[in-house]
């Protein structure tokens, strides 16, 4: 011990010169000693825990016993390992996604920040524009706005009135697509001498025609038996409006085939002229510019006349098979037109089942006819003087007696129909000759470029001369036909 002290004293100057390095080495040695102690403590702790686990009671059911009992121990272990592997993979994927999202957030460049700022500006501008538009739609009414929209809504800046004006203006935006293109679908009616007493609106599809498709022939359209007679006969009593349930591009050609020279049908309307409401297209009779007291509609779809069901005569859709339902409708429609009816709606309402209207009308007519015959018989029996002279008229119009009024109306209607059809045939022939003569009277693009087009006055003179030639040719052919007969 003394020798060590002496050695330290003798070497003190040398150690003092290296004091800093010795101090550092001592600190490092101390830290290494502390770390080694910690490791020894943790190892001893784990060894103690392992001994405790070994001392725990083990299960009696070993793997050998379970295997002898028929239980597959290895499969259960494999499944457990597989599930553990899947959960570990899921955790790894979730951690990778979270880390990637964090990296994306950290990777925002100046361009991304600029885009985000512009997007915020856009949202602010859009919201402020919508708010300004909403306030503008709450303003007081202007003079040029629709009167129907102003109805029952006054000016003022109370919350209730502002909301009502906003709602009315907002709904008017959508009514542009729901309403017909014009407020009045038909022009004003002609003056009294040329005006028909009633307006009859009839549908085209499954009433006058029926279209069907098959693989062999494609689309085919059949015309209902009696359709030409139905239109021609009733055209002398009614202003007939053909209101198709299909779009114009599909139904216009069929409508033209039904009446090529527009002699029977006054106007054609299509699906574009319907009102779209509650998901269906409705044929609104109030848009026809006609008095609803004088309008009737015949249709096969209940939705078509749901706004005016009291003006409707419902019919079952025609399936393309031959029938006589069109002809059976004529007597009732003729009666309505010839009786100078003030309002058609109460008369239509008096029928219990409108779909069987022709049959019910025939029953009523038969009752009236029986009563009329009985009255005529009583009159003839009371006139004993004519009986003595042998001049008593025969009942029911045979031999010059009085006729039933509806029979007389029908006979007169048949005569007018024959005369009218004769005029139509002559007009068709005249139109055919006119088309043949006018087909060669055309002007080419060369005539337009060179200025060889006649003036409007010269064109009018040419048309008048051509019309005279057509009339003379038509009269000549007419005389030839009469001579051949």
Swiss-Prot record:
GO biological process annotations for this chain's record? Answer: protein import into mitochondrial matrix; regulation of mitochondrial membrane permeability
The yes or no answer to whether the keyword Transmembrane is present is yes
Stated role = Essential component of the TIM23 complex, a complex that mediates the translocation of transit peptide-containing proteins across the mitochondrial inner membrane. Required to direct preproteins in transit and direct them to the channel protein TIM23, and possibly facilitates transfer of the translocating proteins from the TOM complex to the TIM23 complex.
Compositional bias per record (Basic and acidic residues), positions renumbered to this chain = 76-88
Its Gene Ontology cellular component terms are:
TIM23 mitochondrial import inner membrane translocase complex
Taxonomic lineage is:
Eukaryota, Fungi, Dikarya, Ascomycota, Saccharomycotina
Subcellular localization, as worded in the UniProt entry:
Mitochondrion inner membrane
The protein depicted here goes by the name Mitochondrial import inner membrane translocase subunit TIM50
Q: Which family does it belong to?
A: Belongs to the TIM50 family.
All residue ranges annotated as the FCP1 homology domain in the record:
193-336
Transmembrane among the record's keywords? Answer: yes
Membrane-side (Mitochondrial matrix) residue stretches: 36-120
Q: Which CDD domains is this protein grouped with?
A: HAD_FCP1-like
Q: Which residues cross the membrane?
A: 121-137
**Mitochondrial intermembrane compartment segments:** 138-485
Q: Which GO terms describe its molecular function?
A: identical protein binding; mitochondrion targeting sequence binding; protein transmembrane transporter activity
């Amino acid at each position: 011990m003394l020798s060590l002290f002496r050695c330290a004293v003798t070497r003190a100057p040398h150690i003092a010169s290296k004091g800093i390095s010795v101090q550092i080495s001592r600190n490092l040695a101390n830290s290494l000693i502390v770390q080694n102690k910690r490791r020894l403590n943790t190892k001893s702790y784990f060894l103690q825990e392992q001994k405790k686990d070994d001392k725990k009671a083990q299960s009696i059911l070993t793997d050998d016993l379970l295997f002898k009992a028929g239980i597959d121990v290895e499969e259960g272990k494999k499944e457990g390992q597989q599930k553990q592997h899947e959960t570990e993979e899921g955790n790894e994927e979730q951690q990778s996604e979270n880390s990637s999202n964090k990296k994306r957030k950290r990777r925002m460049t100046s361009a991304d920040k600029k885009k985000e700022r512009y997007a915020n500006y856009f949202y602010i501008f859009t919201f402020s524009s919508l708010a300004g538009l909403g306030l503008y739609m709450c303003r007081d009414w202007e003079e040029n706005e629709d009167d129907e929209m102003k109805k029952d809504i006054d000016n003022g800046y109370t919350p209730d009135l502002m909301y009502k004006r906003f709602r009315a203006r907002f709904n008017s935006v959508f009514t542009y697509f729901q309403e017909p293109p014009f407020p009045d679908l038909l022009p004003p009616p002609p003056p009294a001498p040329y005006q028909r007493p009633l307006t009859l609106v009839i549908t085209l599809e499954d009433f006058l025609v029926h279209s069907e498709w098959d693989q062999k022939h494609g689309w085919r359209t059949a015309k209902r038996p009696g359709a030409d007679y139905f239109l021609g006969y009733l055209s002398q009593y009614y202003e007939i409006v053909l209101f198709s349930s299909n779009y114009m591009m599909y139904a216009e050609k069929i409508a033209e085939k039904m009446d090529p020279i527009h002699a029977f049908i006054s106007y054609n309307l299509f699906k574009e002229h319907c009102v779209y409401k509650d998901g269906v297209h409705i044929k609104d009779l109030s848009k026809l510019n006609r008095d609803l007291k004088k309008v009737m509609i015949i249709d096969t779809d209940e939705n078509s006349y749901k706004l005016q069901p009291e003006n409707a005569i419902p019919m079952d859709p025609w399936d393309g098979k031959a029938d006589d339902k069109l002809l059976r409708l004529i007597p009732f429609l003729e009666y309505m037109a010839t009786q100078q009816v003030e309002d058609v709606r109460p008369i239509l309402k008096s029928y219990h089942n409108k779909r069987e209207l022709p049959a019910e009308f025939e029953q009523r007519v038969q009752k009236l006819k029986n009563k009329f015959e009985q009255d005529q018989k009583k009159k003839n029996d009371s006139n004993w003087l004519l009986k003595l002279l042998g001049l008593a008229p025969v009942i029911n119009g045979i031999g010059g007696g009085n006729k039933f009024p509806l029979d007389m109306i029908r006979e007169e209607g048949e005569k007018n129909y024959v005369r009218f059809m004769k005029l139509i045939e002559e007009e068709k022939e005249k139109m055919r000759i006119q088309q043949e003569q006018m087909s060669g009277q055309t002007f080419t693009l060369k005539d337009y470029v060179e200025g060889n087009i006649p003036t409007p006055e010269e064109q009018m003179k040419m048309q008048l001369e051509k019309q005279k030639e057509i009339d003379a040719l038509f009269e000549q052919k007419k005389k030839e036909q009469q001579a051949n007969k």
